[in-house]
Amino acid sequence: MVGTALLLLALLPGTSSKHGTPRAPLLPGAPGPWLRRPLFSLELSDAEDAFPRRAGPLEVPADSHVFVQAALARPSPRWGLALHRCSVTPSSRPTLGPALVLLRGGCPADDSVSFSPPPRPDAASVSRFSFRLRPVFNASVQFLHCQISRCRRRSSHHRRAVRLTPVPLTPPAPLRCLPQDEACAGSSLSLGTDSPHLHMLTQPIVVTIPRPSPRPSKSLPGRSVHPEPPAPAPAALEPAPVVALVLAAFVLGAALAAGLGLVCAHSAPPPPGPPPRASLSGPQLQRPPVGRDGTTQ
């Protein structure tokens, strides 16, 4: 039983049958605490010199230009940045579905891709390019995927140090930084897709559809169509003129009613009354004579 236990302890990784024997150090190329910190940054913008941009996904209309900036999270005099492959897909995973390839091997794979000069001549840790977001995918949210790695800057001091230092048993070292024209000429070696130095960064893009402009009116050829000026907005009325207009309308209505009353009073026929009496100066009726016995004669 004791022998079996000792054999199991000897086979366990990280343990030794002899006490006091130090553990083997990790290889320099093995993953360590430095991988927890971000090494690169990928930013998008709708203008060439609008870096850094506000937080949040980029929102651009379809068939417009998108500007990309890839940079090292911490600039270093020894390390530079190299772009290997960039593509646009409708999925957040770069390996699923169709893709619009923009860069392949660090060189433009689309006609609309153009590299911009770095913000400073000595800024080897920043790489900028732009492309036209063609309406290839029917998706409102698309994703830009870029494979980025670090590269060694050219330095004579660094080359002498490499020659004097023995080569350890580590993964392949990063490539040397080369200018864009020299890298696309085929003079540089490309990293494999499973290289530990490659890092994939993804940024979302919100694609909007612009509204169509109104069609111009038909006109005779050779005549320029001038746009109609916009109608002036009605001015707000002040309260004083409104009150004056109301009072004037009231007075005018009262005067009109009074005038109509006078006209009706003078043009109406007189009311019927008793028959007129006979005048004293006119002929009077004579009574018949009365006799003594009270009879008329």
From Swiss-Prot:
Residue ranges the record marks as coiled coil: none
Region of interest called Disordered, as start-end residue ranges on this chain: 208-233, 267-297
Range of residues in the leader sequence: 1-17
Listed name of the protein: Transforming growth factor-beta receptor type 3-like protein
GO CC annotations, alphabetized: plasma membrane
Location(s) in or outside the cell: Cell membrane
Pfam families per the UniProt record, alphabetical: Zona_pellucida
Superkingdom of origin organism: Eukaryota
Compositional bias ranges of the Pro residues kind: 268-277
PTM note: Glycosylated.
Membrane topology type: Single-pass membrane protein
Disulphide bonds in the chain: C86-C146
TM regions (residue ranges): 242-262
Main location: membrane
Tissue: Expressed in pituitary gland gonadotrope cells.
Keyword terms, alphabetized: Cell membrane, Disulfide bond, Membrane, Signal, Transmembrane, Transmembrane helix
Disruption phenotype: Females show no effects on puberty onset, estrous cyclicity and body weight. They have increased litter sizes relative to wild-type with normal litter frequency. Females ovulate more eggs in natural cycles with increased uterine implantation sites. They have increased numbers of antral follicles and corpora lutea. Double knockout females for TGFBR3L and gonadotrope-specific TGFBR3 are infertile. They have increased serum follicle-stimulating hormone (FSH), pituitary protein content relative to controls. They have larger ovaries with increased numbers of antral follicles and corpora lutea.
